[in-house]
Protein backbone atom coordinates (compact mmCIF):
# COMPACT_ATOMS: atom_id res chain seq x y z
CA UNK A 1 0.00 0.00 0.00
CA UNK A 2 1.37 3.46 -0.84
CA UNK A 3 1.83 5.99 1.93
CA UNK A 4 -0.59 8.92 1.51
CA UNK A 5 1.18 12.28 1.75
CA UNK A 6 -0.60 15.61 2.13
CA UNK A 7 -1.10 17.73 -0.99
CA UNK A 8 -1.87 20.99 0.83
CA UNK A 9 1.67 21.70 2.04
CA UNK A 10 5.03 22.35 0.40
CA UNK A 11 7.07 19.17 0.21
CA UNK A 12 10.72 20.05 0.73
CA UNK A 13 13.48 19.40 3.25
CA UNK A 14 11.61 21.41 5.90
CA UNK A 15 8.27 19.60 5.51
CA UNK A 16 6.58 18.48 8.73
CA UNK A 17 3.31 16.75 9.53
CA UNK A 18 3.38 15.27 6.03
CA UNK A 19 1.12 12.23 6.37
CA UNK A 20 -2.52 12.11 5.34
CA UNK A 21 -3.57 9.58 7.96
CA UNK A 22 -7.28 9.89 7.15
CA UNK A 23 -6.53 8.84 3.58
CA UNK A 24 -4.30 6.02 4.83
CA UNK A 25 -7.21 4.68 6.87
CA UNK A 26 -9.61 5.06 3.94
CA UNK A 27 -7.15 3.42 1.52
CA UNK A 28 -6.72 0.37 3.74
CA UNK A 29 -10.49 0.05 4.07
CA UNK A 30 -11.26 0.21 0.34
CA UNK A 31 -8.39 -2.11 -0.56
CA UNK A 32 -9.90 -4.76 1.69
CA UNK A 33 -13.42 -4.15 0.40
CA UNK A 34 -12.12 -4.45 -3.16
CA UNK A 35 -10.40 -7.78 -2.54
CA UNK A 36 -7.00 -7.37 -0.88
CA UNK A 37 -6.31 -10.23 1.54
CA UNK A 38 -3.32 -8.62 3.24
CA UNK A 39 -1.63 -5.22 3.43
CA UNK A 40 2.11 -4.61 3.35
CA UNK A 41 3.33 -1.19 4.45
CA UNK A 42 6.48 0.79 3.75
CA UNK A 43 7.88 -0.82 0.67
CA UNK A 44 9.19 1.31 -2.18
CA UNK A 45 6.00 3.28 -2.86
CA UNK A 46 5.18 3.15 0.84
CA UNK A 47 8.02 5.66 1.34
CA UNK A 48 10.17 3.38 3.49
CA UNK A 49 13.37 5.35 2.74
CA UNK A 50 11.87 8.80 3.32
CA UNK A 51 9.70 8.52 6.44
CA UNK A 52 10.87 9.13 9.98
CA UNK A 53 10.49 6.48 12.68
CA UNK A 54 7.61 8.42 14.23
CA UNK A 55 5.83 8.76 10.88
CA UNK A 56 6.13 5.05 10.15
CA UNK A 57 4.63 4.19 13.53
CA UNK A 58 1.79 6.72 13.07
CA UNK A 59 1.01 5.29 9.63
CA UNK A 60 1.01 1.74 10.95
CA UNK A 61 -1.31 2.66 13.80
CA UNK A 62 -3.79 4.35 11.45
CA UNK A 63 -3.86 1.38 9.08
CA UNK A 64 -4.11 -1.23 11.84
CA UNK A 65 -7.06 0.61 13.39
CA UNK A 66 -8.81 0.90 10.03
CA UNK A 67 -8.22 -2.74 9.11
CA UNK A 68 -9.57 -3.90 12.48
CA UNK A 69 -8.26 -7.47 12.08
CA UNK A 70 -10.05 -8.09 8.77
CA UNK A 71 -6.76 -9.01 7.05
CA UNK A 72 -3.15 -9.19 8.28
CA UNK A 73 -1.15 -5.95 8.27
CA UNK A 74 2.59 -6.38 7.69
CA UNK A 75 4.38 -3.28 9.00
CA UNK A 76 7.52 -1.94 7.34
CA UNK A 77 10.41 -3.34 9.37
CA UNK A 78 13.31 -2.84 6.95
CA UNK A 79 16.17 -0.80 8.44
CA UNK A 80 19.92 -0.52 8.08
CA UNK A 81 20.70 -2.81 11.00
CA UNK A 82 19.35 -5.45 13.36
CA UNK A 83 19.03 -3.21 16.43
CA UNK A 84 16.98 -0.56 14.64
CA UNK A 85 14.73 -3.27 13.25
CA UNK A 86 14.15 -4.58 16.78
CA UNK A 87 13.27 -1.08 18.00
CA UNK A 88 10.82 -0.63 15.15
CA UNK A 89 9.17 -4.03 15.62
CA UNK A 90 8.58 -3.34 19.31
CA UNK A 91 6.65 -0.22 18.29
CA UNK A 92 4.70 -2.13 15.64
CA UNK A 93 3.69 -4.78 18.12
CA UNK A 94 2.44 -2.11 20.52
CA UNK A 95 0.11 -0.63 17.87
CA UNK A 96 -1.24 -4.05 16.89
CA UNK A 97 0.46 -4.98 13.61
CA UNK A 98 0.09 -8.66 12.74
CA UNK A 99 3.46 -9.08 11.10
CA UNK A 100 6.46 -7.53 9.39
CA UNK A 101 7.14 -6.53 5.80
CA UNK A 102 10.83 -7.13 6.05
CA UNK A 103 13.68 -6.58 3.65
CA UNK A 104 17.21 -6.41 5.01
CA UNK A 105 20.07 -3.96 5.60
CA UNK A 106 21.36 -2.64 2.27
CA UNK A 107 24.23 -0.20 2.77
CA UNK A 108 26.43 -3.16 1.91
CA UNK A 109 25.20 -6.37 0.33
CA UNK A 110 24.79 -9.09 2.94
CA UNK A 111 26.36 -12.53 2.72
CA UNK A 112 24.24 -15.68 2.77
CA UNK A 113 25.11 -16.40 6.39
CA UNK A 114 24.37 -12.80 7.43
CA UNK A 115 20.96 -12.82 5.72
CA UNK A 116 19.92 -16.00 7.52
CA UNK A 117 21.18 -14.72 10.88
CA UNK A 118 19.38 -11.38 10.46
CA UNK A 119 16.00 -13.00 9.93
CA UNK A 120 16.67 -15.61 12.60
CA UNK A 121 17.48 -12.89 15.15
CA UNK A 122 14.24 -11.02 14.48
CA UNK A 123 12.15 -14.19 14.50
CA UNK A 124 13.66 -15.32 17.81
CA UNK A 125 13.17 -11.86 19.34
CA UNK A 126 9.52 -11.69 18.24
CA UNK A 127 8.14 -15.24 17.98
CA UNK A 128 4.57 -13.90 17.78
CA UNK A 129 5.15 -11.78 14.65
CA UNK A 130 4.75 -13.25 11.16
CA UNK A 131 7.36 -12.22 8.60
CA UNK A 132 6.72 -11.32 4.97
CA UNK A 133 10.07 -11.41 3.15
CA UNK A 134 10.88 -8.58 0.77
CA UNK A 135 13.22 -9.98 -1.91
CA UNK A 136 14.04 -6.95 -4.08
CA UNK A 137 17.43 -7.60 -5.59
CA UNK A 138 17.86 -3.96 -6.68
CA UNK A 139 17.07 -2.46 -3.29
CA UNK A 140 19.08 -5.02 -1.34
CA UNK A 141 21.93 -5.34 -3.86
CA UNK A 142 21.46 -9.05 -4.53
CA UNK A 143 18.75 -11.71 -4.64
CA UNK A 144 18.10 -14.29 -1.96
CA UNK A 145 19.72 -17.48 -3.26
CA UNK A 146 18.11 -20.89 -3.39
CA UNK A 147 20.38 -22.08 -0.58
CA UNK A 148 19.30 -19.17 1.62
CA UNK A 149 15.62 -19.79 0.87
CA UNK A 150 16.10 -23.36 2.07
CA UNK A 151 17.49 -22.07 5.39
CA UNK A 152 14.85 -19.34 5.77
CA UNK A 153 12.13 -21.95 5.26
CA UNK A 154 13.22 -23.47 8.57
CA UNK A 155 12.08 -20.29 10.39
CA UNK A 156 8.37 -20.88 11.06
CA UNK A 157 7.45 -17.19 11.35
CA UNK A 158 8.40 -16.55 7.71
CA UNK A 159 5.13 -17.16 5.91
CA UNK A 160 5.41 -15.44 2.53
CA UNK A 161 7.70 -13.44 0.28
CA UNK A 162 7.44 -10.62 -2.21
CA UNK A 163 9.44 -12.51 -4.79
CA UNK A 164 11.47 -10.66 -7.39
CA UNK A 165 9.56 -10.49 -10.64
CA UNK A 166 10.23 -12.46 -13.78
CA UNK A 167 8.77 -9.71 -15.98
CA UNK A 168 8.72 -5.97 -15.33
CA UNK A 169 6.51 -4.21 -17.87
CA UNK A 170 7.43 -6.90 -20.36
CA UNK A 171 11.17 -6.89 -19.62
CA UNK A 172 12.53 -10.32 -18.56
CA UNK A 173 14.68 -10.56 -15.44
CA UNK A 174 16.88 -13.50 -14.49
CA UNK A 175 15.12 -15.70 -11.95
CA UNK A 176 15.36 -19.03 -10.23
CA UNK A 177 11.73 -19.43 -9.18
CA UNK A 178 11.33 -23.15 -9.76
CA UNK A 179 14.40 -24.06 -7.72
CA UNK A 180 13.43 -21.62 -4.98
CA UNK A 181 9.93 -23.08 -4.79
CA UNK A 182 11.39 -26.55 -4.37
CA UNK A 183 13.77 -25.25 -1.70
CA UNK A 184 11.02 -23.77 0.50
CA UNK A 185 8.92 -26.93 0.06
CA UNK A 186 5.59 -25.22 0.69
CA UNK A 187 6.69 -23.53 3.91
CA UNK A 188 7.00 -20.02 2.41
CA UNK A 189 4.64 -18.67 -0.24
CA UNK A 190 6.86 -17.10 -2.90
CA UNK A 191 4.48 -14.53 -4.36
CA UNK A 192 5.16 -13.22 -7.84
CA UNK A 193 4.03 -10.02 -9.54
CA UNK A 194 0.61 -10.17 -11.21
CA UNK A 195 2.19 -10.39 -14.67
CA UNK A 196 3.81 -13.66 -13.61
CA UNK A 197 0.80 -15.12 -11.82
CA UNK A 198 -0.21 -17.45 -14.63
CA UNK A 199 3.27 -18.98 -14.55
CA UNK A 200 3.36 -19.55 -10.79
CA UNK A 201 -0.21 -20.84 -10.79
CA UNK A 202 0.22 -23.16 -13.76
CA UNK A 203 3.48 -24.66 -12.49
CA UNK A 204 2.94 -24.57 -8.72
CA UNK A 205 -0.77 -23.80 -8.22
CA UNK A 206 0.11 -20.50 -6.50
CA UNK A 207 -3.14 -18.87 -5.38
CA UNK A 208 -1.85 -15.40 -4.42
CA UNK A 209 0.45 -12.61 -5.60
CA UNK A 210 1.90 -9.30 -4.49
CA UNK A 211 0.56 -6.30 -6.34
CA UNK A 212 1.29 -2.59 -6.56
CA UNK A 213 -1.31 -2.26 -9.31
CA UNK A 214 -4.17 -2.96 -6.91
CA UNK A 215 -3.50 0.51 -5.47
CA UNK A 216 -4.23 2.05 -8.88
CA UNK A 217 -6.94 -0.17 -10.30
CA UNK A 218 -8.10 -3.15 -8.23
CA UNK A 219 -10.68 -4.30 -10.78
CA UNK A 220 -8.21 -5.88 -13.22
CA UNK A 221 -6.39 -7.66 -10.38
CA UNK A 222 -9.57 -9.25 -9.10
CA UNK A 223 -10.65 -10.17 -12.64
CA UNK A 224 -7.26 -11.78 -13.18
CA UNK A 225 -7.62 -13.67 -9.92
CA UNK A 226 -10.97 -15.08 -11.02
CA UNK A 227 -9.51 -16.13 -14.38
CA UNK A 228 -6.36 -17.72 -12.99
CA UNK A 229 -8.04 -19.61 -10.18
CA UNK A 230 -10.45 -20.95 -12.82
CA UNK A 231 -7.37 -21.97 -14.89
CA UNK A 232 -8.54 -19.69 -17.72
CA UNK A 233 -5.06 -18.53 -18.67
CA UNK A 234 -6.21 -17.15 -22.03
CA UNK A 235 -8.55 -14.73 -20.29
CA UNK A 236 -5.84 -13.87 -17.79
CA UNK A 237 -3.53 -12.99 -20.67
CA UNK A 238 -6.12 -10.59 -22.10
CA UNK A 239 -6.32 -8.85 -18.72
CA UNK A 240 -2.53 -8.75 -18.42
CA UNK A 241 -2.29 -7.18 -21.87
CA UNK A 242 -4.78 -4.51 -20.82
CA UNK A 243 -2.72 -3.81 -17.72
CA UNK A 244 0.43 -3.56 -19.79
CA UNK A 245 -1.35 -1.07 -22.07
CA UNK A 246 -2.08 1.08 -19.01
CA UNK A 247 1.64 1.04 -18.18
CA UNK A 248 2.88 2.01 -21.65
CA UNK A 249 5.59 4.65 -21.54
CA UNK A 250 6.19 4.24 -17.81
CA UNK A 251 9.26 2.06 -18.25
CA UNK A 252 12.18 4.15 -19.65
CA UNK A 253 13.53 3.06 -23.01
CA UNK A 254 17.00 3.44 -21.52
CA UNK A 255 16.46 0.36 -19.37
CA UNK A 256 15.76 -0.99 -15.92
CA UNK A 257 18.52 0.96 -14.16
CA UNK A 258 16.87 4.25 -15.11
CA UNK A 259 13.51 2.84 -14.02
CA UNK A 260 14.82 2.23 -10.52
CA UNK A 261 16.33 5.73 -10.31
CA UNK A 262 12.97 7.47 -10.70
CA UNK A 263 10.37 4.82 -9.90
CA UNK A 264 9.23 6.35 -6.59
CA UNK A 265 8.14 9.76 -7.94
CA UNK A 266 6.85 8.23 -11.19
CA UNK A 267 4.73 5.60 -9.48
CA UNK A 268 3.42 7.84 -6.72
CA UNK A 269 2.34 10.26 -9.45
CA UNK A 270 0.63 7.41 -11.27
CA UNK A 271 -1.18 6.12 -8.20
CA UNK A 272 -2.38 9.60 -7.26
CA UNK A 273 -3.55 10.36 -10.81
CA UNK A 274 -5.48 7.09 -11.00
CA UNK A 275 -7.84 8.53 -8.39
CA UNK A 276 -8.26 5.35 -6.37
CA UNK A 277 -5.88 6.28 -3.55
CA UNK A 278 -4.91 9.91 -2.99
CA UNK A 279 -1.32 9.11 -2.20
CA UNK A 280 0.13 12.57 -2.87
CA UNK A 281 3.73 13.25 -3.85
CA UNK A 282 6.96 11.50 -2.98
CA UNK A 283 8.98 12.82 -0.04
CA UNK A 284 12.58 14.10 -0.09
CA UNK A 285 14.97 13.10 -1.45
CA UNK A 286 12.80 11.20 -3.94
CA UNK A 287 10.51 14.14 -4.76
CA UNK A 288 12.66 15.36 -7.65
CA UNK A 289 13.07 13.70 -11.05
CA UNK A 290 13.15 14.67 -14.73
CA UNK A 291 9.77 16.10 -15.74
CA UNK A 292 9.23 13.34 -18.29
CA UNK A 293 9.06 10.79 -15.46
CA UNK A 294 6.21 12.71 -13.82
CA UNK A 295 4.52 13.01 -17.21
CA UNK A 296 4.83 9.25 -17.72
CA UNK A 297 3.26 8.67 -14.31
CA UNK A 298 0.36 11.00 -15.06
CA UNK A 299 -0.27 9.39 -18.44
CA UNK A 300 -0.34 5.91 -16.91
CA UNK A 301 -2.65 7.14 -14.17
CA UNK A 302 -5.10 8.45 -16.74
CA UNK A 303 -5.08 5.07 -18.47
CA UNK A 304 -5.75 3.47 -15.09
CA UNK A 305 -8.93 5.55 -14.99
CA UNK A 306 -9.94 3.89 -18.25
CA UNK A 307 -9.24 0.52 -16.64
CA UNK A 308 -11.69 1.44 -13.86
CA UNK A 309 -14.39 1.66 -16.51
CA UNK A 310 -13.51 -1.64 -18.17
CA UNK A 311 -12.90 -3.51 -14.90
CA UNK A 312 -14.98 -1.71 -12.24
CA UNK A 313 -13.98 -2.56 -8.69
CA UNK A 314 -16.47 -3.54 -6.01
CA UNK A 315 -16.61 -0.23 -4.14
CA UNK A 316 -17.02 1.60 -7.45
CA UNK A 317 -19.97 -0.61 -8.40
CA UNK A 318 -21.52 -0.11 -4.97
CA UNK A 319 -21.16 3.67 -5.24
CA UNK A 320 -22.74 3.68 -8.70
CA UNK A 321 -25.61 1.53 -7.44
CA UNK A 322 -26.18 3.89 -4.51
CA UNK A 323 -26.21 6.87 -6.87
CA UNK A 324 -28.80 5.18 -9.08
CA UNK A 325 -30.99 4.46 -6.05
CA UNK A 326 -30.78 8.11 -4.97
CA UNK A 327 -31.61 9.25 -8.51
CA UNK A 328 -34.59 6.88 -8.69
CA UNK A 329 -35.87 8.00 -5.29
CA UNK A 330 -35.64 11.64 -6.33
Regions found by a protein language model. Give the residues of each.
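Alpha-helical scaffold segments in soluble metabolic enzymes
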Residues: 30, 62, 121, 151, ...
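Catalytic alpha/beta core domains of metabolic enzymes, predominantly
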Residues: 124-125, 136-253
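Short, flexible/disordered intra-domain loops and linkers
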Residues: 11-16, 171-172, 251-259
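Active-site beta->alpha loop and helix N-cap motifs at the rims of alpha/beta catalytic domains
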Residues: 2-143, 284-287, 308-327
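C-terminal alpha-helical cap/extension of soluble enzyme domains
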Residues: 1-6, 34, 217-330
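Secondary-structure boundary/capping signal
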Residues: 71-72, 130, 160, 188, ...
Amino acid sequence: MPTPVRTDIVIDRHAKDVLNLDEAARAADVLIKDGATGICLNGTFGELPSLTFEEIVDLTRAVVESVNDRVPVFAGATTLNTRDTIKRVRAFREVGAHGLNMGRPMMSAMSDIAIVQYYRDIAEEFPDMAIFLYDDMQAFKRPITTEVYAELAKIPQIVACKYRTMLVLGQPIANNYANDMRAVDGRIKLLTHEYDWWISNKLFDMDAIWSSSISMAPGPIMAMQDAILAKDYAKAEVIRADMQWASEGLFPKTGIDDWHVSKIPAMKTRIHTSGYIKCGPALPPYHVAPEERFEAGRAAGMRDREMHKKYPHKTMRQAESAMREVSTAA
